[in-house]
Amino acid sequence: MHKFLPIAYFQNQFLPFNDAKISIATHALHYGTGAFGGLRGIPDPQNPDQILLFRLDRHCKRLSDSARYLHYDLAADKIQSIIVDFVKKNQVKTSFYIRPFIYTSDLGIAPRLHKIEKDFFVYGLELGDYLSPDGVSCRISSWYRQADHSLPLRGKISGAYITSSLAKTEAVESGFDEALLMNSQGKICEASGMNIFVVRNGELITPGYDQDILEGITRDSILTLAKDLGIPTIERPVDKSELFIADEAFLSGTAAKITPIKRVENYELPKTRPITQKIRDQLIAITENRDPNYQDWVYVVPLG
């Protein structure tokens, strides 16, 4: 059972979470015409009266870009201002997840984006580990990732996540923790809601943006961090067979953080993961604002 934060932002005001309700006739419920973001907030280990938000500006920019797909003009700085106020009003002292959402709010039918009202809300919930930090087993899904020429995949468009939902349930019901999806070219592109990285021969490999992947903010941060750590990085298509003989592999995302892959189908991956661990440790230090070289990645929200 999720524990939701007490205050939400809904219809241009802050109000109790339980009072933020929409009609069953809301357009976005029927047509998937929405876009969402997701970011974590954690208490500052050095000062519990502060909340740390990782790469807030990037999250707000991506959501603002997603709004453009929906023909909605919502500036990134406005999203950021609302999220900061949302954090202050909730006064949370534990790790939590923020879900901002843009959607077509009209009541009625007919799939369209023109001449229709849009709105924006924010809510949150307490969140610990989304996936096991010790590692997950993955099934290669029978469902394929949509192609970018069919759907705008660079943002988190809500209707597109039916494929992720089908793949995740298929994986769990067949005894796995997570699903890996291939694109229409038969290349591994991402998990149900996370990007994927593979380590082979000391090189960090991940599918590029031309492989129908989400423009992951954690993914981008890992690539920058790996280069700064002197780890060779390559963005290229990833074959299914490569995963079976990978030295290491992991998933990345705001909710998942860095989650090792311990098994793909019936192929066990090595239990020693030096590159994964090195990046993971450094990323934790950055998100906790303990690395002065990356302080511009962390937005500090005072609760006082």
Which residues fall in each region the model found?
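ATP-grasp fold ATP-binding core
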Residues: S95-I102
